[in-house]
Design a protein with these regions (language model features):
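Conserved NTP-binding/hydrolysis module of P-loop NTPases
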Residues: 13-18, 76-78, 86-105
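Conserved alpha-helical scaffold flanking the Walker A/P-loop in AAA+ ATPase domains
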Residues: 41-42, 108-127
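Short regulatory helix/loop adjacent to the ATP-binding pocket of P-loop NTPases
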Residues: 68, 172-187
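C-terminal alpha-helical "lid" subdomain
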Residues: 1-7, 161, 183, 200, ...
Length: 270
């Protein structure tokens, strides 16, 4: 269309509230999120390891990535594996590359090299504590989980050499409850369950993103907010997706706000 205003011009925002191309820092924290983050930080300070489990899109990665990004680099060495579905040796290589360990030599098994390297870091005069975070950990083979557990102990000092954070969906929580996973589960201080947002928290989540995007506060009418809350059941990624579709529909219809009527008439929302 000729002289069609952009979405930013039409709605009067600086950023799209639900865009994936810019990062909100800090992310939205519910009260439960804040408690989880505070407790997780305390555990890391004492060399502990833990899991965070919950439905895909619940906000696990966002919360822990923000926690990791704020760890003091003078005391912590961060290792982030974004995908737990790597083969056993590929996982060790990915960790080695982030630690600066040569991964192509065959004289010494890579797992042994990593164990020695991490132990050396832990026993150095100015020691630093590695924190290994693995996302999509429900895809990890049991052998890979055992490898990871072997990296977090320091036999010379009989103390923790590193901390392990594994993030996964509800399948990971079920896996950890199996008897054959007990050697792994006992090395984790706790499994934090990441719960969906309540309806009130969903509205707070949307309002927070609108505020961070410098968008009009009344972008979503109250009845539309209530419908989004009921439809998405507190699932953050779905809230983002539904919000994106509704704003696109409002833009197409030349509406400045998202109403309940617009929500009900949007055939792309399933």
């Amino acid at each position: 269309m000729i002289n069609q205003p952009t979405m930013a011009e039409h709605f009067g925002w600086q950023f799209h509230p639900f865009s994936d191309t810019w990062r909100i820092d800090p992310p939205f924290y519910s009260q439960r999120d804040q408690r989880l983050a505070d407790q997780a930080l305390q555990l890391l300070q004492y060399g502990k390891s833990f899991a965070v489990t919950g439905p895909s899109g619940a906000g696990k990665s966002t919360l822990i990535e923000h926690l990791m990004s704020n760890l003091d680099a003078n005391y912590y060495l961060k290792v982030h594996i974004h995908y737990g579905g790597l083969q056993r040796n590929a996982l060790l290589k990915a960790i080695g590359e982030q630690l600066g360990v040569e991964t192509n030599t065959r004289a010494v098994p890579l797992l042994v090299k990593l164990q020695k390297h991490i132990a050396a870091i832990a026993t150095a005069k100015q020691s630093i504590h590695p924190v290994i975070m693995v996302d999509d950990a429900h895809l990890l083979a049991r052998e890979s989980l055992m490898d990871l557990c072997s990296l977090i102990v320091c036999p010379p000092k009989k103390t923790a050499a590193a901390s392990l954070i594994i993030l996964g969906d509800d399948m990971l929580a079920k896996q950890l409850n199996l008897a054959l996973m007990n050697p792994i589960k006992t090395r984790l201080t706790v499994n934090f369950p990441m719960e969906p947002l309540s309806e009130e928290e969903t509205e707070q989540f949307i309002a927070y993103r609108i505020n961070q995007a410098k968008a009009p506060k009344d972008l979503f009418e109250p009845d539309a907010m209530a419908l989004i809350s009921a439809h998405c059941h507190g699932h953050r990624r779905q809230i983002m997706n539904v919000g994106t579709l509704l704003l696109a529909e409002a833009y197409y219809q030349k509406q400045k706000t998202v109403s309940a009527q617009l929500f009900m008439g949007c055939d792309l929302i399933q």
